[in-house]
């Protein structure tokens, strides 16, 4: 796997890491490499992981009272079609092994996650799909803040089932 700690995606700066977590070449990998590996190991559809500290999703991850099984109650079809449920992982210090442990438990059934007070993590079957999923998550988080306390028409169970079929 290749991973980038931060900054631009310069191919010369990517870290190459073995499936067991051994650093093979390139820049020193991110301290969060363990949770990337946990997602790859526990979700065969996960071929790419994108983790950001984007404004809207990170702001959402800081709110109290979120449903930890699904932070985003479906109100647009694209959340359902691209991501499904978005579980919340409790706050741990960045790089803490418990992030990887919690994501490993959630990985098989999910492809998008919020790390409490930290930010979003998404998977995809390609880097492009993971980036698209991240964009959808970020824009949906933005909509949540734009809508604020206004009444939202959430999708019904029937509408959600139709989108998943």
Language-model features: locations:
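Glycine-rich flexible loops
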Residues: 4-165
């Amino acid at each position: 796997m290749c991973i980038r700690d931060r900054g631009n995606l310069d191919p010369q700066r990517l870290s190459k890491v073995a499936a067991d977590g051994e650093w093979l070449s390139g820049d020193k990998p991110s301290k969060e490499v363990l949770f990337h590996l946990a997602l790859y190991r526990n979700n065969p559809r996960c071929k790419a992981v994108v983790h950001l500290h984007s404004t809207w999703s990170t702001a959402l991850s800081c709110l109290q009272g979120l449903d930890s099984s699904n932070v985003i109650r479906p109100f647009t079809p694209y959340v359902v079609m691209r991501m499904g449920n978005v579980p919340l992982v409790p706050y741990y210090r960045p790089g803490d092994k418990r992030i990887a442990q919690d994501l490993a438990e959630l990985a098989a059934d999910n492809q998008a996650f919020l790390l409490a007070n930290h930010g979003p993590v998404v998977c995809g079957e390609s880097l492009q799909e993971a980036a698209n999923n991240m964009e959808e998550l970020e824009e949906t988080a933005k909509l949540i803040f734009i809508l604020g306390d206004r009444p939202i028409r959430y999708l019904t169970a029937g509408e959600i089932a139709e989108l998943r079929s």
